[in-house]
Amino acid sequence: MVELDLSAPLDRHRATVLPEWIDWNGHMNVGFYVVAFDKATDTLCEQFGCSWDYTRQEIGMTFVLEAHVTYDREVTQGDPLRITTQILDHDAKRLHFIHAMYHATEGYLAATNELMLMNIDYASRRSAPWPDFARERIEKLAAAHKPLPVPEQAGRIIAIKRKK
């Protein structure tokens, strides 16, 4: 298991916008934002011991229950990305968090991805409490992130705002 990183927010994931991620508008396609964020989720899961080894050893797995992406500013081919992660809440089976994608050299916010992740028992494929090793680490991460302000993108719903 990796050494627990209690930086707040978690700031461990880096990526580069690949040529195949570019759409006909000349910027990163919406689906590849999700790919980049999914890799950042893998980085988060490594922090509490529920990564690929967790599934490969037939202990359990994690499923995304809900996801919301905001697209704040374009990124293009070759742009370096820095993705941070903030734990918003957790319970015995679930983890609520938000990723923020930044242009790694220019520093602007490109997108966010808010997720609800659930622990799944490998054998039953049903929800299950986090194993003790994961729960303990999640609690430490959540405590480290608790003082952070909740990002304005968290909890958003999709709607057209009408002027009254």
What is the role of each PLM region?
Residues 15, 94-96, 114:
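Short, small/polar residue-rich loop motifs at catalytic or cofactor-binding pockets
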Residues 92-102, 108:
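Compact nucleic-acid interaction/catalytic patches
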